[in-house]
C-alpha cells in the first residue's frame, strides 16, 4: 500500500494534468478543423440534408465528449490529492499541521480547476459549432425551396 501512495504522490499531477492537456490539444485541433471546414463548405453541392448533416457534425461528438468528461478527470485528480492528504495526515501520528493540510488540499483542487477550464472551452466550441450546423442546414433548406421542382 505504501508503494501505491508513493506512486500516486509522484505521478498523479503528471497523469491527470497531462491527460487534460492532451484533451485540450485534441479539442483545439478538432475545433480548428471545423472552423476551416465551415469557412469553405459549399452547401449547394449536397443532394440531401442527411449528407450535409453528416459533414457538418463531423468531429462534434469528440468535442462534446471532451467537454463532458474533462471535469470528471479533474475531479479524479482532486480525489486522489485529497486521499493523499488524508494518508499523510494518518501517517503523521495525529500531529496535525493545518498549513500543510491547506497547501495539499489547494494543490489537489487545481486538477478540478483545469478540468473545468478544458470543459468550458470545449463546450463554447461545441455550442458555437452547433449554431453553425443549424445555420448551414437552414441555408440548404432555403436553397432547396428556391430550386424548381422536378417531376419524377
UniProtKB/Swiss-Prot annotation:
SS bond partners: none
Name of the protein: Biopolymer transport protein ExbB
Compartment(s) where it occurs, according to its Swiss-Prot or TrEMBL record: Cell inner membrane
InterPro entries registered for this protein in UniProt: ExbB/TolQ_transport, MotA_ExbB_proton_chnl, TonB_ExbB_2
Organism, scientific name: Mannheimia haemolytica (Pasteurella haemolytica)
Annotated keywords: Cell inner membrane, Cell membrane, Membrane, Protein transport, Transmembrane, Transmembrane helix, Transport
Superkingdom in the source lineage: Bacteria
GO BP terms in the entry: protein import; transmembrane transport
Amino acid at each position: 500500500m505504501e508503494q501505491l501512495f508513493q506512486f500516486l504522490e509522484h505521478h498523479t499531477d503528471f497523469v491527470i494534468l497531462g491527460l487534460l492537456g492532451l484533451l485540450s490539444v485534441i479539442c483545439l485541433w478538432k475545433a480548428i478543423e471545423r472552423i476551416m471546414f465551415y469557412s469553405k463548405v459549399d452547401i449547394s453541392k449536397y443532394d440531401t440534408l442527411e449528407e450535409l448533416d453528416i459533414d457538418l457534425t463531423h468531429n462534434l461528438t469528440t468535442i462534446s465528449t471532451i467537454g463532458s468528461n474533462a471535469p470528471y478527470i479533474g475531479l479524479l485528480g482532486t480525489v486522489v490529492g485529497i486521499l493523499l492528504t488524508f494518508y499523510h495526515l494518518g501517517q503523521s501520528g495525529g500531529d496535525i499541521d493545518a498549513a500543510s493540510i491547506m497547501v495539499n488540499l489547494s494543490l489537489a483542487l487545481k486538477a478540478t480547476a483545469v478540468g473545468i477550464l478544458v470543459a468550458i472551452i470545449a463546450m463554447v466550441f461545441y455550442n458555437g459549432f452547433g449554431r453553425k450546423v443549424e445555420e448551414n442546414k437552414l441555408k440548404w433548406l432555403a436553397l432547396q425551396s428556391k430550386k424548381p421542382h422536378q417531376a419524377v
